[in-house]
Amino acid sequence: MSASVPLLQKLNQRFVDVIQEMTIALDEISLEISAEQLLEVCLALRDEADFKFELLVDICVVDYSDYGVSEWETNRASLTGFERGVDNSGEQRSIPWHKPRFAVVYHFLSLVHNQRLRLRVFATAEPPQVLSVITLWPAANWYEREAFDLYGVFFVGHP
């Protein structure tokens, strides 16, 4: 049995009405929740004894604008690069995608329980925005700035 299974069960019990998607891969749990629930869930993940994710390791943004597209258009032929190994006769998007374009992904570490957790929320507003977690983890300051600079995702409440 994986070491992450007991944590998976505790997360599922605690956030049964909040979790939209839950997976486990390579002994690391990934949760997807709505952006509206972010601060409530993060506070519980940080403070509750069953979780104790006191360390925010990283925040990144994923741009799903071309997710599932197996080929990109070019204006000229090339003997090198990705496109020469792809069959262009098929459909353009090989994986259907019906979610928002940008996701903000938080990576946490519980030193007490020696567990890692990935939490994903989609920025559904336009322009893309989610709540800032800087009040819970001051280290979020630079991660949120970088996400804004690179992707334009706005973190509401960021100083």
Question: What is the predicted function of each stretch?
Answer:
Residues 1-159:
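Terminal low-complexity/charged segments
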